[in-house]
């Protein structure tokens, strides 16, 4: 059954429509609307970087690009491959495209065993974490792009309208509510970043979270089953104090916050009050552009939106970046006329950690 879920069929003439570079190959039927040469080159470098970091030898790896008519891109990882869907007429910017491919690559190596709510935070959190920190360390991602991604993730985590959910509750909504869906990703990422800082602090910079992850990859490939308690044991072997309370705080309940030095001493952190993006309609509206579940007297209702009408609004990552006092502009078409409806972000706010490059002062 698992094999069937990982099976993809691509029908058509692929003789000209592929690119091979060492063990890597990229395949497409519809021209994907991106520079496949530079996409594949970046993929190759990132693949080498990751297989080296995770202590896993390189092997044949295939990327399949397919066309879809929607906004943005989505991707799913399978053994030795990933499939990425994108809209050739509205290609993603290079930065977002790279984040997605780096995230999918991590899935080739990093897994835990156990039920979904016990492992998804690690699988998706480590993919979000390493897709940012490894390219940063290798100079493939500059500090500004790294910080932008980390700070958006912090907002998605700590100002999420679903932030009060436990990881088990979030897992139950994983496929039906995109806000709950993001929680295991972002909580897992900030837990790993925080753990890396604790390990470095306690071992005078000798042990990193990479070392633990490499051990997991090695022992799982030798047939060992490693679940959440096995993970905690591995951390405790180095830190000599119970790990479950940290996991509970940062992942299971999400009540904790990562430490200031979670991403290294070159960054400093401050807590910023940011809007909780809750506009008085069902959160699916933000993805589908089709108003659902309008809350009477809620922000959208007060601004004049109607249930079940089609709207045009910024992509969710842009909405998450908005600050208190900003205004969300929504385009509505009614009877051939289009109007702009503005919703001021004056609702609930939450304190969220945001990092910036540390300014070195000389005295
Ligand atoms: Zn993923």
Identify the function of each model-found stretch.
Residues 1-17:
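Propeptide (latency) domains of metzincin metalloproteases
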Residues 105-106, 110, 150-162, 212-222, ...:
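Long, well-ordered core segments of solenoidal/helical folds
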Residues 219-363:
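Beta/coil-rich, acidic/histidine-enriched accessory regions frequently appended to metallopeptidases
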Residues 33-45, 91-96, 100, 117-121, ...:
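Soluble non-cytosolic domains of exported or imported proteins
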Residues 165-253:
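Pan-zinc metallopeptidase signature
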Residues 56-64, 115-119, 138-147, 205-212, ...:
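Surface-exposed patches in mature extracellular/periplasmic domains of secreted proteins
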Residues 15-119:
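Juxtacatalytic substrate-recognition/specificity segment
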Residues 116-189, 202:
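Acidic/His/Gly-enriched intrinsically disordered linker/tail segments
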């Amino acid at each position: 059954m698992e094999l069937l879920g990982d099976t993809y069929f691509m029908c058509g003439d692929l003789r000209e429509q592929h690119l091979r570079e060492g063990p890597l190959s990229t395949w497409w039927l519809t021209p994907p609307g991106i520079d496949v040469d530079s996409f594949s080159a970046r993929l190759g470098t990132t693949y080498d970087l990751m297989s080296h970091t995770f202590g896993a030898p390189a092997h044949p790896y295939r990327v399949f690009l397919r066309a879809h008519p929607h906004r943005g891109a989505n991707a799913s990882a399978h053994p030795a491959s990933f499939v990425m869907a994108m809209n050739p007429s509205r290609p993603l910017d290079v930065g977002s495209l790279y984040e997605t491919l780096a995230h999918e690559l991590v899935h080739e190596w990093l897994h835990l065993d156990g039920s979904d709510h016990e492992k998804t935070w690690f699988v998706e959190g480590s993919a979000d974490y390493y897709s940012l920190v490894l390219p940063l360390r290798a100079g493939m991602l500059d500090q500004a792009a790294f910080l932008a991604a980390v700070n958006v993730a912090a907002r998605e985590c700590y100002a999420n309208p679903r932030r009060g959910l436990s990881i088990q509750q979030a897992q139950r909504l994983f496929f039906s509510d995109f806000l709950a869906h993001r929680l295991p990703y972002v909580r897992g990422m900030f837990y790993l970043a925080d753990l890396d800082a604790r390990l470095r602090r306690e071992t005078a910079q000798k042990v990193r979270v990479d070392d633990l992850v490499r051990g997991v990859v090695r022992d799982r490939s030798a047939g060992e089953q490693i679940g959440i308690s096995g993970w905690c044991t591995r951390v405790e072997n180095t830190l000599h104090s119970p790990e479950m309370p940290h996991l509970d705080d940062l992942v299971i309940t999400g009540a904790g916050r990562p430490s200031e030095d979670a991403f290294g001493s070159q960054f400093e952190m401050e807590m910023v009050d940011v809007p909780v993006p809750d506009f008085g309609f069902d959160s699916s509206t933000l993805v589908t552009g089709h108003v659902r579940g309008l809350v009477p007297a809620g922000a959208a209702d007060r601004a004049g939106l109607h249930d079940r009408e089609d709207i045009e609004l910024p992509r969710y990552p842009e909405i998450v970046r908005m600050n208190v006092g900003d205004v969300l502009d929504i385009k509505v078409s009614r009877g051939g006329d289009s109007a702009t409806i503005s919703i001021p972000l004056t609702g609930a706010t939450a304190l969220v950690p945001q990092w910036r490059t540390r300014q070195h002062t000389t005295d």
